[in-house]
Each structure stands twice: as C-alpha cells, then as structure tokens.
Amino acid sequence: MSRKPEQAFWEWLRRAIGKNCYLERIENRVGMGTPDLHGVFMGADGISRAIWVELKSAQWSTQGTLRVPAYKPHQAAWHERYLKAGGKSIYLVETDTGEVLIIPGRLAGQVDGMMKAAMPQGVTTVSKKAKAPEIIAAILAV
C-alpha cells in the first residue's frame, strides 16, 4: 500500500526538523478544519513559539497556478478564526518542484490557485534540501 503524499511529507518534516522542535501530529475527525500538526519551535532568540501547521502536497500547473487537491474551505475558515483569536498558524505546502511554501494562516483562503509569478506578500519558500535551522527560521519568520 503506497503512502499518501501528505503522509510522506509529514515523514520528511519529522526527519528534517523533528529533533529541533516539538511536533504533534493531530488525527482529528471531530473538529472541522483543525490543522494536521501542532508545533513548538525555538527561535534563534531562545523564545519558543507555538504554531498550528496544515500540511499539503501540491503541484504547479503548466500555467504556474498552485493546485492543492486536498484543499478544503473549512480549513481556511479555521485559520481565519484562529488568527482573529490571536493565534499563529501556517500552511506548509510541498510542491512537485522540491520546494516547500510557508504560507501564513491569514492567506489560507488563497492557497489553492495561488500564482507562482505573483505570490502574496508573506509567502516564503525553502528547499527540501535545507537544514533544520534554516527551515525553522523560515517558519518563524512568517
């Protein structure tokens, strides 16, 4: 049985940064839109930050549009409610080009259909070949 793309992405993330932060995978079938992970990330300043993380695997279309097959509007609604309450959340989107997009939760409604040539301000890209400190710094910078 083959793994789903998001499962493989989770396994990569856990191997890439798991020893440098706290990651808890959430398997919630009750709360609509609850993200896939809860993480606590230590910044270079020594301050820990808690962030909810939605994992997605996506492909760029030939027109340069991001296609996220498992995108659900109620997930974006969750991020919007969480942001209004003062929380921080992100989307980590693995693309077919070997990059990971780090998208602030405030842009959750724009994830599916995002244009590569006109990324919204605040979206960061990191290579899957990056080391843990670089990945964590990019996550915390969003």
Regions found by a protein language model. Name each.
Residues 37-39, 46-60:
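Conserved catalytic cores of phosphodiester-cleaving nucleases, focusing on short active-site segments
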Residues 33:
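Beta-rich catalytic cores
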